[in-house]
Amino acid sequence: MSEKIKRLNFKHLQQAAWKGTKKSIPATTLCLLLFFMNMALFGYKNAVIAVPLTIIFNRLKDFSPDRWHPYSVMLINLVLATTAHLADMNVWLCVTLDFAATYLMVFLLTDSDTSKAYYSYGFGLVLYQSFSTTVPELRLRLMAIVVSSAIATLGLVVMYFLKRRQTGFKLDPRIFNPFVHLGGKTREFLKGTARAFKNLAAMLRFHLFWDPSEPLESGTFDFRLTRFAIRISLLVTFSFFLEQVFNIPKGYWLPLNVFIMTLNFYEDSMVKIKQRVGGNIAGVFISAILLHYITGFTGHMIILSIGTFLGYAVDNYLFRATYMTCYAIALSTLFMKQSEVFELRLAYVLLAAVIAVIGSRFIFANKKTDFQT
């Protein structure tokens, strides 16, 4: 009986490993292609473009082609790169632009309590700002985004042809015509922006002057969304402010972790914080062991590639955070001392956890228990 159980468990592990491999190969291939291509053609600062575009690709590859919106994806990234360039000029622009960009991004790209369409673009904003650019470098970054977006879209087309019999989706060539979709998207953006700022003003009037506002009736989706968008914008902006004022090494790890840990509901944020902190601690420990035996540029790239593959292969966020920490450390230790990287990684994730806990608990908090009927 025990032998039969062992065979069943081994078969289950094989099936899970094969499922994870099939899931990870497309995203890993695109991520590494964009990473090394941008590093070679556009400089190491633009290698980070691979991260947000791969997350977007990984989300869209299972959607029907009419939901890809390739020009919108490219334009949003171009706007975020330009915003990040301007925000890096001084503290006042940092506070103003980072708050506005994060607020609009979260508000306009969230259509349900569990939606995380904004997630990949938040990565882009943080990474674009952290790897700052001069004006000539900005032009290079915009070119890199255009090229990378085209390659990511090509990847979606390849995935469509590989899976079309299984999904039954139809590919309408008109989705690649910018004049067909951008007009409607522009109108949606303007209406959404007006609604976003109207809700922001109403929420602030209510909390600052106790002026009840009709558009924000308590318990509605708009009410929860506006509170969440304000909260995450305040926390991310505060983190960017600390990074810019103190000019701390690897400072972008702070706003990035705060952004990841802050979710719509307090209960979900607490789960994500525990997983993120646990994954980072495990990732630092594993990286310390690996880097003791694996040295040199090639060795670091091997760890980076394996971390990327495993990160996209698993669904459990604790393991994903572990593997992606190995990815980040393998890259960072090429330019900094290992001990310093380990210390900074742990310090930032713990500080980010404190910020996210306080913010999720006390700043425009949304608790599931408050909205249960």
Label for each model-derived stretch:
Residues 1-323, 331-373:
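Alpha-helical transmembrane segments and their membrane-interface boundaries
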